[in-house]
Amino acid sequence: METGIGNNNGTNLVVVYPKPDDPERAERLDNILLPALRDLQEQGTKYTMIEKVSRLRDGDLRGRRIIFAICLSEAGINIEYYKLLEYFRAHESCLEGSVGGIIVDGASELYTKALARRLAFSANMAGCTFPGKPLVEATGSLGNFHVLSGISGKTPIDVYEDQVRALLGKVLDFGWPVASGEDGRLRILAVHASTRSTSNTMLLWDKVKTGLADRADIEEISVRNGTIQDCRGCNYETCYHFGEKGKCFYGGIMTEQVYPALLESDAVVMVCPNYNDAVCANLTAFINRLTALFRAYDFSQKRIYAIVVSGYSGGDIVSEQIIGAFNFNKSFILPPGFAMVETANDPKSILAVPDIDKKAALFADRIR
């Protein structure tokens, strides 16, 4: 049953649950989510459920712990979900100070991940932080739980239930990690694959970096011009064996420079031009090669940030790829407003973007 937020200052958790037009489509998620919420309530955690975006008022979701639960129709659509996206985009900072998790229940094998990435990007740009691995995704067949089902000996539906309960706890328990550098300085690894003299993205990063100099130690690594090989797909045992030693079978710049810098860092900044509406090949290889290290080390206290510059459009698509790779898959924290997304085509035209110095300074201030 839907209740309002405004007069319930004791709420520990807000569940934003835009129901699909077909009530039967929500039955599977209802049967998993509602008992988990009742158990939390019995343990002293209050929650409020919102099913209609029209009930929200600016300020309702600021400073909250939030679960976004979305059920999709057979066609992969939930009309109320799109109203939710519109609300986030129309109300700047409406999620400031909030921490979120996402549950997507699909009716087919398609659309769940794409919808979750778009939701995460829009909510994040409105101020929502997402802890590492904030998504519980259930495809129509529950086939995406096959591996965990085999490992645990549980049925896919039981694995789904366990994942939802774990996500509730993760969102409620999340705390911001402290910087690990001397005197509280932030340790940042910036990764790029651009030519500094011609790259708008690098020019923008240089402006952002200026705003970080007094409180961060920054290591910059270039992975351009064939300095990095992509992942070749070793079996799990081989990958884990090398990862335990902070290495990868294929060696090179990844094991010599990137892995040590990443392990020491508090935050990674992806300096990322838009190539064909995608992360460029060398940066994609960098992401793929992190798998060996991820198998053996915990990245859940590290933050991911991005500077994305497009020649025409599509910066949101590239940002969503970074969310999928680092936040959904590699467990990095997605801080509020994690990406600075700009458009600049001709060389050095980023310098002519209105208020670019102010924007760069504001973004630098968000890197914590």
Protein language model annotation of sequence segments:
Residues 207-208, 219-226:
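Redox- and metal-dependent alpha/beta enzyme cores, enriched for Fe-S-associated oxidoreductases
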Residues 254, 264-267:
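Flexible loop/N-cap segments at domain edges
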Residues 226-259:
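Cysteine-cluster motifs in flexible loop/terminal segments that predominantly coordinate metals
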Residues 221-222, 270-272:
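Short, conserved beta-strand edge motifs with alternating hydrophobic and charged residues
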Residues 224, 249-254, 284-291:
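A general structural motif
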